[in-house]
Amino acid sequence: MAKVPDMFEDLKNCYSENEEDSSSIDHLSLNQKSFYHVSYGPLHEGCMDQSVSLSISETSKTSKLTFKESMVVVATNGKVLKKRRLSLSQSITDDDLEAIANDSEEEIIKPRSAPFSFLSNVKYNFMRIIKYEFILNDALNQSIIRANDQYLTAAALHNLDEAVKFDMGAYKSSKDDAKITVILRISKTQLYVTAQDEDQPVLLKEMPEIPKTITGSETNLLFFWETHGTKNYFTSVAHPNLFIATKQDYWVCLAGGPPSITDFQILENQA
């Protein structure tokens, strides 16, 4: 009699083979590091201020962060903006994070120069006129003269009576800036030197009187006055990287440096 094939036997063999394959796969996975597994070696003494590990878990509205060494806040370009020491395995909440962000005692890297939006909040109060009727000569011994009703230029003069004479008024900053802030007025007039953009001629702006308080967009009337020996520099408050300058065959303007001439000699009592 022919033997009838045992279907259950085939199924058992198939199951047995799959079980062996499964065991092999399990064994392989146990001996293989997880893609998400991260391990850290012993920390060197010179690296103690660096962030070592960070584990995050959220429950409800509270974020629990566990730090082994410290937490740092970095900008997108990788520069460290804030650094805060925490105890080992310390858990902090959202309130703690808010306190860290607003803590004025944290180490914060400040920019070298403040944006104009911050400068616009500074108030400058007039103090007094500190110089009367002086002449400005550039490094080529050219004197500043009137080009027309609006603009100034520089020219070599035989008769200094043709040169523009200026008065200089001092202002005090509300942020207690150590720099000397001044306004330049053409003597015996109400015309004030007013800055524009780089390589644009400075304007002569007529006002009814010298401004008692200057803020915001009006800071284009003000300049930081610096002296180095006999050289005088006038940096625009509205554009802190630009100076009053003379330029060949051009009006007096704002410039960052050569080929424009940014240093001047002050000739006083030339009335």
From Swiss-Prot:
| Chain residue ranges for the region called Nuclear localization signal (NLS) | 82-86
SUPFAM superfamilies for this protein = Cytokine
Query: Does Nucleus show up as a keyword for this record?
Result: yes
Which chain positions have N6-myristoyl lysine-type lipid attachment? 82-83
Q: Name one GO biological process term.
A: positive regulation of tumor necrosis factor production
Highest taxon in the source lineage: Eukaryota
Residues the record marks as carrying a glycan: 102, 141
Example of a GO MF term: copper ion binding
Keyword hit for Nucleus? yes
Instruction: Supply the CDD domains for this chain.
Output: beta-trefoil_IL1A (cd23295)
Q: Where in the cell is it found?
A: Nucleus; Cytoplasm; Secreted
Cross-referenced PROSITE patterns, in alphabetical order? INTERLEUKIN_1
Q: Which residues form the propeptide?
A: 1-112
- Principal subcellular localization: nucleus
Q: Which residues carry this modification: N6-acetyllysine?
A: 82
Q: Could you give the domain comment from the record?
A: The similarity among the IL-1 precursors suggests that the amino ends of these proteins serve some as yet undefined function.
> How the protein assembles, per its UniProt entry?
Monomer. Interacts with TMED10; the interaction mediates the translocation from the cytoplasm into the ERGIC (endoplasmic reticulum-Golgi intermediate compartment) and thereby secretion. Interacts with IL1R1. Interacts with S100A13; this interaction is the first step in the export of IL1A, followed by direct translocation of this complex across the plasma membrane.
User: Member of which family?
Assistant: Belongs to the IL-1 family.
Q: What does this protein do?
A: Cytokine constitutively present intracellularly in nearly all resting non-hematopoietic cells that plays an important role in inflammation and bridges the innate and adaptive immune systems. After binding to its receptor IL1R1 together with its accessory protein IL1RAP, forms the high affinity interleukin-1 receptor complex. Signaling involves the recruitment of adapter molecules such as MYD88, IRAK1 or IRAK4. In turn, mediates the activation of NF-kappa-B and the three MAPK pathways p38, p42/p44 and JNK pathways.
Q: What is this protein called?
A: Interleukin-1 alpha
The organism is: Homo sapiens (Human)
Taxonomic lineage from the root:
Eukaryota, Metazoa, Chordata, Craniata, Vertebrata
